[in-house]
Amino acid sequence: MAEHTEETNLLQPTSRFQLLKDILGLYPAIDGEKHKSTLGTAGWLRAGVLGANDAIVSVAASNSQGQVLIAALAALFAGALSMAVGEYVSVASQKDMEDADLEKERWELENNPEGELEELSLLYQERGVDPVTATEVARQLMAKDALQAHAIEELGIRDFSQARPFAAGMVSFAMFITFGCIPLLVGAWIPYRWYAIGAITGVSLILLAISGAVGAFFGGANMLLGAFRVTYGGALAMAITIGVGFLSETLNISDMSYRDE
């Protein structure tokens, strides 16, 4: 009977704050295991994987040799710059929206602190916390860092200063150039067309698998599934791109030229 009572007590929260932690899922590590969130790596990881995959697919599908090699090299740098600028604009836009939300929240905290306290308390109550406990916890969190408390619970912004547009753009550019050079060099050193196509395709599929596995590893996901997903998607994109290229060659689109005035 004593053992049953002790076990029951262990399952009960020791304080109202502990109750809130249980409801929010803030459990301690089990058996000394340290849990590390992978959310902080999402920005640069996405930029790197996108840059690498786009480079592999774009360059591998170019089937470059001779003069086409020069065009592929130009396309490599054009694609890298395009990826870098696109990633920069995307992350910068996200950061601007987050900054605007934080500035609005900062103004509300300065001009209506009691209203913000009630708002935070209601958020906890909606998740199952009783009003007294919710108000107590909201008050304690706001006393420590009111802006952070509201940013996390109300705006869903957990990583302050994590959005780095310039860094994301540079990572995307570097990964595009690095991974794009590999199939480009393979195509440059093999003079026979079909051998080159086979070699470029094989190397590109391997690179796609590596890219997917590495991305899954840093993201804490299944590496095999990540490798398969990226390889399958990249192979499909390459097949479509090469198919369009062969269709263009069949229709002699490359022989078309602008007329002189």
From Swiss-Prot:
It comes from the Eukaryota. Keywords: Ion transport, Iron, Iron transport, Membrane, Metal-binding, Transmembrane, Transmembrane helix, Transport, Vacuole. Fe cation 3 binds at E108, E116, E119. Induction: Down-regulated under low iron conditions. Fe cation 2 binds at E105, E116, E119. The chain crosses the membrane at residues 66-86, 170-190, 197-217, 233-253. One of its GO terms (molecular function) is metal ion binding. One of its GO terms (cellular component) is vacuolar membrane. It is a multi-pass membrane protein. InterPro entries: Ccc1_fam (IPR008217). GO terms for biological process: intracellular manganese ion homeostasis; iron ion transport. Pfam families: VIT1. Fe cation 1 binds at E105, E108, E116, E119, E154. It catalyses: Fe(2+)(in) = Fe(2+)(out). It is found in: Vacuole membrane. Belongs to the CCC1 family. Vacuolar iron transporter involved in the transfer of iron ions from the cytosol to the vacuole for intracellular iron storage. This is Vacuolar iron transporter. It comes from Acanthamoeba castellanii (strain ATCC 30010 / Neff). The gene is VIT.
